[in-house]
Regions:
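Canonical Radical SAM [4Fe-4S] cluster-binding loop centered on the CxxxCxxC motif
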Residues: 1-27
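Conserved SAM/AdoMet-binding glycine-rich loop
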Residues: 32-125
Length: 125
């Protein structure tokens, strides 16, 4: 979905590394075009997006595009626990073929999450 990390604030993320510090996202239409090309060329219908974390807005756009195109795939990827990552968004993602997401939960302590600059709370997760 993208190259790099859109958050870039975690205390442990080395944003001096090119693959983390530079964020370049692809549009939902471009991603859907690429997915459809791979399905046509290879017959593969399972996709694992290995972004550092996909923004909820990008996930929503991709899901909407896949549904509009009637693209029949299974996909999964990585997320940050954002306030906008709602049950409704999860339903939309599932409708588009998303079978799983994994989120980075390094600790279950608000104090440590703040020290790590994760930008989330235990309650959000």
């Amino acid at each position: 979905m993208a190259h790099g990390c859109y958050w870039k604030k975690c205390s442990f993320g080395d944003v001096s590394l090119d693959y983390i510090g530079r964020y370049e996202g692809a549009s939902a239409a471009v991603l859907a075009d690429r997915i459809e090309a791979i399905v046509r060329e290879t017959g593969q219908t399972g996709f694992h997006f290995v972004d550092e974390a996909a923004p909820p807005k990008s996930l929503k756009a991709l899901a909407t595009e896949l549904i509009a195109r009637n693209t029949d795939i299974s996909w999964w990827g990585n997320i940050r626990f954002e306030k906008t990552f709602s049950p409704e968004l999860c339903e939309l993602l599932a409708d588009s073929g998303c079978i799983a997401v994994s989120g980075g939960l390094e600790v279950a302590s608000d104090r440590l999450l703040n020290l790590m600059k994760k930008g989330v709370s235990v309650d959000q997760v």
